Swiss-Prot record:
Residues 1382-1413 are annotated as: Disordered. Glycans are attached at residues 128, 304, 337, 640, 849, 991, 1162, 1196, 1320, 1514. Residues 280-335, 336-391, 392-438, 439-488, 489-498, 685-718, 719-766, 767-821, 822-877, 878-927, 928-975, 976-1024 form the Laminin EGF-like domain. The alpha-helical domains I and II are thought to interact with other laminin chains to form a coiled coil structure. Domain IV is globular. The gene is Lamc3. Gene3D superfamilies: Galactose-binding domain-like (2.60.120.260), Laminin (2.10.25.10). This is Laminin subunit gamma-3. PANTHER family: LAMININ SUBUNIT ALPHA 5 (PTHR10574:SF406), NETRIN/LAMININ-RELATED (PTHR10574). SUPFAM superfamilies: EGF/Laminin. Residues 40-279 form the Laminin N-terminal domain. Residues 508-684 form the Laminin IV type A domain.
Length: 1581
């Protein structure tokens, strides 16, 4: 049943909508187009649509906020509930209002749901659903589809317009009266108000439980529904902008009364679809709606309508009232008819009623008016309706009415004329309300009638006034015949005010030629003069032309009174003729002018000659003038007329006959003499001040010509004599008095001063200057200043010397001294001021890097001749090398020699001294330390320090032999010449013997050992077969025999061992030197005596110094420097002592070599034994034939060879002795060099101590009285005295400190003595051990050599008996040799054992020394830190001292004591800067000692002003000296400093290179800019 009712209701709604649509549209009308096919307007409507689709609906209550459970009904009551959950935060469980108007699908339904009854949703609590349509719609139906059962009561409301009240549309309720107070089933009768909402219970049943529909038709039950277009009430009824669904009561089964939560959760509102059918309301004037510019939905209006709903006409379409479009009539808005003169109109209902056109035009243009702008405004007209309206423009004063006729002509008053009545009739002027007034112009000054508008008369050039009745300023004498009306005032240009002069009458200057030419002369072109042709009738004018008649003197001169008057020429012309062309020429005052006649007479046909007159007006306004002149210049020409001539150009071809000049008349004036017409053109001037005379031609009394002798045209100016005399009016020269002079008496005479312009007799007073010379007065103060002081003097009273001079000319500071020129050696700018002191003459602005009282010295940092004539020869910068100099800008001012660091030479300290190398910044150079024996000279490479070595010598100091060389001596080292095949190494022993490989023997390892032979291919020595063992045994026996023979030889008295020997050929070792021994012994003894003497001298000097130090009392005044010198000398002697010890060590090494060479070795004994053996062989030679002969021959050969060797060895010994002597001399030279090296150090240390003591003197006073800096310079001398007293008090403390320092130094030397002795002992032991080893090696080698020789003799002796004898002797010799070798070897072992013990002792002592050195290093670092702090403190004191000395120097320039203090302060700054640089360079390596530095800072911070500053300074000095010694050592710090200095030097060189490059670039840039500026403008681009 319910489904059938819903379907029937939907059918009813559909049929009703169809009826409405058919009612809205006529048959065949196109609903979507507003115009038909021919362009006629027709009703149009937007498409029918679901206005709710896609629009956002709002619900007052929605489930899921918070989440809740709901249990929908799925069957009959009592069936089980299947509960679900509504959660707005979960999209899958959300049921908000957006699901009301979305796309509705029965298969996948979405719905909006309210909270359940469990949350209080039940009557009287309502749930509202609101839908905003965005604009007015014409609603056809409203449809709701419920997801649950339909409510028991709900209502539909609507708004007719936005923000309007809610109006009920329909009520649905099973209790209409109870719930809404409305009867159920109400219906309307025709004529009743159809805007009534009905209430029905048709859709209030609980079934169906889901999917129930409710459809509401807006026109159902409305009687006028079928006449909708004629019913405004129903049109308003269906119009809605918003729809509201109010859900008021739920349908239940009645089980809710038990309040079961599960039951309550089953009752709620749920709507799955909310549809609103209708059209966008456009009143039949639009076919579509779209968003406007504001984003609001609006109709796209047609039919000249506008508005959101097309509810009104456009502004200019108001010709009929707006109406809704119907099927019969589209009711298009029509435009207003404004005749094209307006675009604005309004609807005028009264006009529409009377005329049928309601458009009333507004703001008509083009001067139109009327409802349709159809006529002209008042006082406008137009020729025809198509032409625009034009203003009448009738003159309000001249017209009778402002309205004109259709042609635009205005009605005029009398005396007024014109199209617009805007001008006066001729002879009238000044149009006004009363008409026009008649003109009254002056005839003499006007040129015609007056201006009809203003009434002003047209005046002549020099006339003014509305009636032209007065002359302009600067003119006078108004005359009718004057073309300009009035004549200009002349007055010689001094006045513009003049008037006619009284007492003058008219006068004529005339020539009538009755009695002759009257002084006239004629001149033709190219001819100076010619005779005149005169007759009683006149002068005959030439017919050829180019003739000029010159007037006599009476016409010339001052003719100013003829200005403006005519010159009349009377001519007699032939019958019927006319006068020829004639011009009047005027000359004067350097000007010239030609005039033509003002009028020419017309020719007359007469048969008699007739007279005619030609008139020339003497006025600049004459139109006939050629090259007219200004007024003033014209009158100036007349004032000095020098020529008046008549120039004829000849008669033309039409002229014939004679022309006679009958009369010439010039009108002028002169003073009144008789009755005659007055000459009103003569002026009298009103002269300004300073002028007088009728024409202002004279200067008044007290005035003069501005230009002397300038004449009347020159201006007059007051006499400028300043009341000290009078002046001539023409020259202006003053006759001065009162001691004044000048053209205007404007100045006092020389020797007088004052203000001559005051005009009093005592203006000028005598000058108070030397010799009453000239002076002047300062205007501001009135002081008198002398202006012509004697040469070299200046000042107000010449009391001081001129710039560049000095002296005291007036004796203001003592006896007068004349001013003398300052002598600045030509080193000042003569154009500058303040070059020297005006009192002392000391130069103040020295140029060219000079200084001194007379600029006679070079400034610090420069050197040269300050008095040289050329600037280029003057002082040049020191340019000291930063690496080798103490300061970059400190050098000898004359020679330029820089103050070099130790062992640095060169003018700029750029290279090391000979014997030194490695120039480093702040340190200087270090000694080459070239070995005196191994080097050629005590010079080395300046960078690497490599010494020039002797042959075979190597090492940086040339202190060792090269590999493969031996015998280090004065000649170098000799080549070992070891056999490359047999020697194990190319290096040999000091005795030249080589180390042999197995199987090789010999000094040079150049032969095979016994029982060995040289293998094939020279690959080495191989052992012989076993058969040669017998030979070896025999050789052993021979060696034993030789040993016996040696013992026998040593026991017997064989005489001198130096006799000739018969030995085998071989090379003697180095130690086998046996001749010249006594010479070497004597030389060595002498040298040792000299060294002992030198040592005694040093000790004696030291004792004398100790005694001298004991006698000198350092506490006495002035002895401080002496003590410092002694301390420095002590250090120098200590350094010298060290050098002597090093030299003694070297000499001991030489002595050991000499000892080894002075005593005969075992080889000598062997040689003696070989000689005895040879003699024995010679005695038995007769018994052994062949063998003896061969042995004898071998012995003799050996003897001869020995003799040769004897001579060579002797010569070598002598040469080596000389070499040793040279070595001694070289050692002595090296000792001298060492002393020379130590001397600069001592001098530098002495200078440093002096400087520190000198620096401390001014600082001690500041340390005790730090507040002294606050006093003025007046008490500086007292402070100096106080400082001297303090210095005297502190000097004993300084002396004690120095003594303590000396004691410490002595103790340090005493501590070093055991180490020195230990070193000497170690060196001696090492030398003895080395000598012993070498001697043993030589002995063994000698024995082996002798054995080899004897075995060779055996090979050459084949007889068995001889071999046996030789073998026996050789065996004895060998035995003796072996015993001796063992003995020498044991002795060497004992010596080496002692050396080992000494070496261990030395090592132990060395460790102790190392520990002590570390302690000393720590102490040195601590002292260094104290020195740094002291240096900083001293720096502050130095800066304070400098400031004080600078103030004192400025205030007391003449104080020599203060100047000396200033120089000392500068020396302090220089010394401290050096120390600062040294400390800064050492800072990196001393960073680990910060702890001790902190302790020292605390100590110094607690130091008060009453503590002994001298002790602190002495400690600082010791620390600095310790630092210097540490830097001089060759440790890691020295290495690092050297690396840093080298890197700094490289960087400085690179920076200097960059600066040089930059300077070159700047110079090139400057040159290019100069070239560019010198180029022409066209080339520069």
């Amino acid at each position: 049943m319910a489904v059938s009712r819903v379907l029937s209701l939907l059918a009813t709604v559909a049929s009703m909508a169809l009826v409405i649509q058919e009612t809205h549209f006529a048959a065949g009308a196109d609903m979507g187009s507003c115009y038909d096919g021919v362009g006629r307007a027709q009703r149009c409507l937007p498409e029918f649509e679901n206005a709710a689709f896609g629009r956002r609906a709002e619900a007052s209550h929605t489930c899921g906020r918070p989440p809740e459970d709901f249990c929908p009904h799925v069957g009959a009551p009592g069936a089980g509930l299947q509960c679900q959950r509504c959660d707005d935060a979960d999209p899958g469980r959300r049921h908000d209002a957006s699901y009301l108007t979305d796309f509705h699908s029965p298969d996948d339904s979405t719905w909006w749901q309210s909270p359940s009854m469990a949350f209080g949703v039940q009557y009287p609590t309502s749930v509202n659903l609101t839908l905003s349509l965005g604009k007015a719609y014409e609603i056809t139906y409203v449809r709701l589809k419920f997801h649950t059962s339909r409510p028991e009561s709900f209502a539909i409301y609507k708004r007719t317009y936005a923000s309007g009240p809610w109006e009920p549309y329909q009520y649905y309720s099973a209790s209409c009266q109870k719930t809404y107070g409305r009867p159920e089933g109400h219906y309307l009768r025709p004529g009743e108000d159809e805007r009534v909402a009905f209430c029905t219970s048709e859709f209030s049943d609980i079934s169906p439980l889901n999917g129930g529909n409710v459809a509401f038709s807006t026109l159902e039950g409305r009687p006028s529904a079928y006449n909708f277009e004629e019913s405004p009430v129903l049109q308003e009824w269906v119009t809605s902008t918003d729809i509201l669904i109010s859900l008021d009561r739920l349908n239940t089964f009645g089980d809710d009364i038990f309040k079961d939560p599960r039951v309550l959760q089953s009752y709620y509102y749920a709507v799955s679809d909310f549809s609103v059918g209708g059209r966008c309301k456009c009143n039949g004037h639009a076919s579509e709606c779209e968003p406007n510019a504001a984003g609001q939905l609006a109709c796209r209006c047609q039919h000249n309508t506008t508005g959101v709903d097309c509810e009104r006409c456009l502004p200019f379409f108001q010709d009929r009232p707006w109406a809704r479009g119907t099927a019969e009539d589209a009711n298009e808005c029509l435009p207003c008819n404004c005749s094209g003169h307006s675009e604005e109109c309004t609807f005028d209902r009264e006009l529409y009623r009377s005329t049928g056109h309601g458009g009333h035009c507004q703001r008509c243009r083009d001067h139109t008016t009327g409802p349709h702008c159809e006529r002209c405004e008042k006082n406008y007209y137009r020729w025809s309706p198509k032409t625009p309206c034009q203003p009448c423009d009738c003159h309000p004063a001249g017209s009778l009415s402002l309205q004109c006729d259709n042609s635009g002509v205005c009605p005029c008053k009398p005396t007024v004329t014109g199209w617009k009545c805007d001008r006066c009739l001729p002879g009238f002027h000044s149009l006004s309300e009363g008409g026009c007034r008649p003109c009254a112009c002056n005839v003499a000054g006007s040129l015609g009638t007056c201006d009809p508008r203003s009434g002003n008369c047209p005046c002549k050039e020099n006339v003014e006034g509305s009636l032209c009745d007065r002359c302009r300023p600067g003119t006078f004498n108004l005359q009718p015949h004057n073309p300009v009306g009035c004549s200009s005032c002349f007055c010689y240009g001094h006045s513009k005010v003049c008037s006619p002069a009284a007492g003058f009458q008219e006068h004529h200057i005339r020539s009538d030629f009755r009695h002759g030419a009257g002084g006239w002369q004629i001149r033709s072109m190219g001819v100076s003069k010619r005779p005149l042709q005169w007759s009683q009738s006149g002068l005959l004018l030439g017919l050829r032309g180019g003739e000029e008649l010159s007037a006599p003197k009476k016409f010339l001169g001052d003719q100013r009174l003829s200005y403006g008057q005519p010159v009349i020429l009377t001519l007699q012309v032939p019958p019927g003729g006319s006068p020829p062309p004639i011009q009047l020429r005027l000359e004067g005052a350097g000007l010239a002018l030609s005039l033509r006649p003002s009028s020419l007479p017309s020719p007359q046909d007469t048969r008699q000659p007739r007279r005619v007159q030609l008139q020339f007006l003497l006025q600049e306004t004459s139109e006939e003038a050629e090259s007219p002149l200004p007024t003033f210049h014209f009158q100036r020409l007349l004032s000095n007329l020098t020529a008046l001539s008549i120039w004829t150009s000849g008669q033309g071809p039409g002229h014939s006959g004679q022309v006679l000049l009958c009369e010439v008349q010039l009108t002028s004036a002169w003073p009144q003499r008789e009755l005659a017409p007055p000459a009103s053109w003569v002026e009298t001037c009103l002269c300004p001040q300073g002028y007088t005379g009728q024409f202002c031609e004279f200067c008044a009394l007290g005035y003069k010509r501005e230009i002397p002798h300038g004449g009347p045209y020159a201006n007059c100016i007051p006499c400028t004599c300043n009341q000290h005399g009078t002046c001539d009016p023409n020259t202006g020269i003053c006759l001065c008095g009162h001691h004044t002079e000048g053209p205007s008496c404007e100045r006092c005479m020389p020797g007088f001063y004052g203000n001559a312009f005051s005009g009093r007799a005592d203006d000028c007073q005598p000058c108070p200057c030397p010799g009453q010379s000239a002076c002047a007065t300062i205007p501001e103060s009135g002081d008198v200043v002398c202006t012509h002081c004697p040469p070299g003097q200046r000042g107000r009273r010449c009391e001081s010397c001129e710039d560049g001079f000095f002296g005291d000319p007036l004796g203001l500071s003592g006896a007068p001294q004349p001013c003398r020129r300052c002598q600045c050696s030509g080193n000042v700018d003569l154009n500058a001021v303040g070059n020297c002191d005006p009192h002392s003459g000391h130069c103040l602005r020295c140029l060219y890097n000079t200084t001194g009282a007379h600029c006679e010295h070079c400034r610090e940092g420069f050197y040269g001749s300050a008095v040289a004539t050329r600037p280029v020869d003057k002082c040049a910068p020191c340019s000291c090398d930063l690496r080798g100099s103490v300061s970059e800008k400190t050098c000898n001012p004359v020679t330029g020699q820089c103050v070099c660091l130790p062992y640095v030479s060169g003018r700029d300290c750029s290279r090391c001294s000979p014997g030194f190398y490695d120039l480093q910044s702040g340190r200087g150079c270090q000694s080459c330390k070239c070995h005196p024996l191994g080097s050629l000279e005590n010079k080395c490479h300046p960078k690497t320090g490599q010494c020039p070595c002797r042959p075979g010598v190597t090492g940086q100091a040339c202190d060792r032999c090269q590999l493969g060389f031996f015998g280090f001596s004065i000649k170098g080292c000799r080549d070992c010449r070891c056999s490359p095949l047999g020697a194990a190494s190319s290096q040999c022993h000091e005795n030249s013997t080589c180390v042999c490989r197995p199987g090789f023997v010999g000094y040079k390892c150049d032969r095979c050992q016994d029982n060995f032979f040289l293998a094939d291919g020279d690959t080495g020595c191989q052992e012989c077969p076993t058969c040669y063992a017998l030979v070896k045994e025999e050789a052993a026996k021979l060696k034993a025999r030789l040993m016996l023979m040696e013992g026998w030889l040593q026991r017997s008295d064989c005489g001198s061992p130096w006799g000739p020997l018969d030995i085998l050929q071989g090379e003697a070792p180095l130690g086998d030197v046996y001749q010249g021994h006594h010479l070497l012994q004597e030389t060595r003894g002498t040298f040792l005596q000299q060294m002992v003497g030198l040592e005694d001298s040093v000790k004696a000097t030291w004792e004398q110094l100790q005694v001298l130090r004991g006698h000198v009392h350092c506490a006495q005044a002035g002895a401080q420097k002496t003590c410092i010198q002694l301390a420095e000398l002590e250090e120098t002697l200590q350094s010298s002592e060290e050098e002597v010890l090093r030299a003694a060590s070297a000499l001991s090494f030489l002595a050991s070599l000499q000892k080894g060479s002075s005593t005969p070795t075992n080889w000598s004994h062997l040689a003696s034994e070989a000689q005895i053996l040879a003699r024995s062989h010679r005695d038995t030679a007769t018994k052994i034939e062949a063998t003896s002969e061969r042995a004898l021959l071998a012995s003799n050969a050996s003897y001869e060879l020995l003799k040769l060797m004897e001579g060579r060895v002797a010569s070598e010994a002598q040469q080596e002795l000389e070499d040793r002597y040279q070595e001694v001399q070289a050692a002595q030279t090296a000792l001298g060099i060492a002393v020379a090296e130590a001397l600069p150090k001592a001098e530098k240390a002495l200078a440093t101590v002096k400087q520190v003591i000198g620096d401390a003197a001014p600082h001690l006073g500041l340390l005790v009285t730090p507040e002294a800096m606050n006093f003025q310079a007046r008490g500086l001398s007292w402070k100096v005295k106080a400082l001297e007293q303090k210095l005297e008090q502190k000097e004993p403390e300084v002396g004690q400190s120095v003594g303590a320092l000396q004691v410490e130094a002595g103790r340090a030397l005493e501590k070093m003595e055991p180490f020195m002795q230990l070193r000497n002992k170690t060196t001696a032991a090492f030398t003895r051990a080395s000598s012993a080893v070498q001697a043993a090696k030589v002995t063994v080698i000698g024995a082996e050599t002798l054995l080899a020789d004897l075995e060779g003799m055996k090979l050459r002796s084949p007889l068995p008996k001889e071999q046996a004898a030789l073998k026996k002797k050789a065996g004895s010799i060998r035995t003796r040799l072996l015993e001796d070798t063992k003995r020498k070897t044991k002795q060497a072992e004992r010596m080496l054992g002692n050396a080992a013990s000494l070496s261990s002792s030395t090592k132990k002592k060395s460790k102790e020394a190392e520990l002590m050195s570390k302690d000393n290093a720590k102490l040195s670092r601590a002292l260094l830190r104290e020195g740094k702090q002291g240096y900083r403190h001293a720096s502050r004191l130095a800066s304070q001292t400098q400031a004080t000395l600078r103030r004192a120097s400025r205030l007391l320039l003449t104080s020599e004591a203060h100047k000396q203090e200033l120089e000392e302060a500068k020396q302090v700054t220089s010394g401290l800067s050096t120390v600062e640089r040294q400390i800064r360079e050492s800072r990196i390596s001393l960073e680990k000692d910060t702890k001790v530095l902190s302790e020292l800072l605390v100590k110094l911070g607690s130091l008060g002003v009453h503590q002994a500053p001298a002790q602190t300074l002495n400690e600082t000095q010791r620390a600095l000296e310790s630092l210097r010694l540490q830097l001089d050592s060759h440790g890691a710090l020295h290495h690092k400093l050297r690396q840093l200095e080298e890197e700094s030097a490289r960087q400085e060189l690179q920076i200097q290179s960059f600066e040089d490059d930059l300077a070159e670039i700047r110079a090139d840039k400057h040159n290019l800019e100069t070239i560019l500026s010198s180029l022409p403008e066209n080339c520069a681009s």
